[in-house]
A protein has these predicted regions:
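Histidine-centered catalytic/metal-binding microenvironments
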Residues: 426-494
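Glycine-rich, aromatic-lined ligand/substrate-binding cores of catalytic
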Residues: 225-351
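A contiguous strand-loop segment
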Residues: 2-128, 148-281
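Short, charged, surface-exposed loops that flank catalytic or proteolytic processing sites
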Residues: 138-144
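Short, well-ordered beta-strand elements within core beta-sheets of diverse protein domains
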Residues: 132-138
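Substrate-recognition/cap regions that form aromatic- and gly/pro-loop-enriched pockets
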Residues: 313, 317-446
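Short Pro/Gly-enriched beta-strand edge/turn motifs at strand-loop
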Residues: 61-65, 146, 322-330
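Short, well-structured alpha-helical segments that form the helix of a local strand-helix-strand
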Residues: 145-154, 304-308
Length: 494
């Protein structure tokens, strides 16, 4: 998927949480309806079969409950996308990334080949459709997640290049696939955040650690030999550069990928480097933008949402701008675009008991014109307003209401944007208050069953809050757009 990812280490966050967040975007020319659900252990089969690649994989016999953000319309696979399991391990997958012909020629992608004549079909590898479903129900730590996915990649291969994030309450790991069967993973420094557009991102990798203590680096068992055999190390100074070895540096990256990383870094570290002008240290076309940085201030969920909603506001590249050269507006691919299906931010809060730690923040449709809502993840069901999405447009669905608000507000941006700003502020403030209230109620309750019931009650209250505010905002932006119709006429009989 054409996505954008932001990871926040525990010492870089405002409250010591690990946070992983990703915009899940549809490809150009279509939209994918999504829903927020809980998948129970009994819903997992003994053998998984991919819809797209037809690969069959036996599953362990002890799956855990997990949340997921699957496709609302069946037929093309599950695409679970993001979630938290009962062990408080979070995962988001995948960020589609890039590679180069040297890698893809040395370790080709494992692509499904349909039957032809007397030749039987050849199953493909695993991909975004499958990865969360194959990994999340069976893992107890972020590191264990990397190890499980790594074994699956080595065994079955993949038909696409992907980046995947894993977290527990203590740490975050980021894994990138390399060709059909290889991979590398790096632990996110606790004091840093990571920005990821659709491009291989890891900018430094310690092979000695990966094949030694494995404190901060893990990789496929033969990666060192693979690099040497196919002459992938391009460094002149003896310091291995994984981007040069495994990644891409194309003209399209400078329009589609590097500008997004530039804006995220520029927002969270505005004075660390010079980001604009002829003397800029980094520009939207820079290939050496850092994979991770220590932020200038602690990062909140609201900061994450702002960054993942970017349309280059405050720069000449904002498609909504009324200033600057017209030819610069919209020249780069925005982070908050029309094709955002959802954003999921998974927050694991270390200062609370285990059953309260996991909060999953969810928003649907274009991030530039929506609102994000927190929900407890350690629950048995999710509210119908988020879980009941279908392929039919409905105001009873948070997904569809969000799509309508975004489309109408975009078409009447000058008059509607302040309605959306008030909507987002109101939702975040009210839902923060509800979360604080229900945290306190649970901390005062010693009965685990009662605490679980309070989480269910809280999620219904949060959904009711956003449903009312979304309906009010839809009414307002509909009025603004209707008032600006081309057949509008000022004279009336009333």
């Amino acid at each position: 998927m054409a996505c954008t990812t932001l990871l926040v280490g525990k010492n870089a966050s405002y409250d010591g949480s690990t946070m992983i967040a990703r915009n899940d975007d549809s490809g150009s020319g279509h939209f994918t309806a999504k829903k927020f659900v809980v998948v129970q252990p009994e819903e997992h089969p003994a053998v998984y079969r991919s819809v797209l690649s037809h690969v069959e994989i036996p599953l362990p016999g002890d799956p855990m409950r997990m949340t997921a953000m699957p496709n609302a319309v069946e037929g093309k696979g599950i695409w679970a996308a993001a979630g938290v399991n009962a062990a408080n391990v979070g995962m988001t997958a995948t960020e589609t990334i890039t590679s180069n012909p040297r890698v893809l020629g040395a370790d080709p992608l494992v692509v499904y080949q349909p039957a032809r004549g007397e030749r039987p079909e050849v199953p493909g590898g695993i991909g975004e459709e499958d990865i969360v479903y194959l990994v999340l129900p069976y893992i107890h730590t972020a590191r264990e997640s990397v190890e499980r996915l790594g074994k699956l990649l080595e065994t079955y291969g993949t038909y696409e290049m992907n980046g995947i994030a894993f977290q527990d309450v203590n740490e975050i790991w980021w894994l990138e696939t390399i060709g059909g069967h290889h991979w590398m993973a790096r632990r996110v420094p606790d004091d840093s955040y990571v920005v990821m557009p659709n491009q291989l991102g890891i900018d430094a990798f310690d092979l000695d650690d990966a094949f030694g203590a494995q404190e901060n680096h893990l990789c496929s068992a033969d990666l060192r030999e693979f690099i040497a055999k196919y002459h992938l190390d391009l460094a002149q100074d003896g310091v291995f550069d994984p981007r040069a070895a495994f990644g891409s540096h194309t003209d399209s990256d400078h329009v589609y990928n590097t500008p997004r990383a530039w804006y995220m870094l520029r927002t969270l570290n505005p004075t660390t480097w010079v980001w604009d002008g002829p003397d800029a240290d980094y520009t939207p076309a820079s290939d050496d933008l850092p994979w991770c940085m220590v932020p200038e201030k602690k990062i909140t969920p609201e900061d994450v949402k702002y960054v993942l909603s970017s349309h280059y506001q405050g720069t000449p590249y904002d498609p909504y701008a009324s200033y600057g050269a017209r030819e610069n507006r919209g020249v780069y691919r925005s982070i908050g675009i029309n094709r955002n299906d959802f954003v999921a931010l998974i927050q694991l809060r270390p200062d609370l008991p285990a059953d309260l730690q996991a909060v999953e923040w969810v928003a649907y449709a274009s991030n530039a014109l929506n609102a994000m809502v927190p929900f407890y993840a350690n629950v048995e069901t999710t509210p119908a307003y988020l879980a009941g999405t279908t392929g039919e447009v409905s105001t009873d669905s948070f997904y569809w209401v969000s799509r309508m608000i975004a489309a109408m507000a975009d078409a009447s941006y000058g008059k509607s944007v302040f309605h959306v700003e008030r909507y987002e502020l109101g939702v975040l403030s009210a839902c923060r208050a509800l979360l604080n209230q229900y945290d306190a109620k649970q901390l005062a309750e010693t009965d685990p069953a009662r605490r679980a019931a309070l989480r269910q009650e809280a999620n219904e209250a949060l959904a009711a809050e956003v449903k009312a505010r979304a309906a009010d905002t839809l009414d307002k932006v509909l009025f603004e757009l209707s008032s600006n119709m081309k057949n509008a006429y000022s004279r009336s009989d009333m």
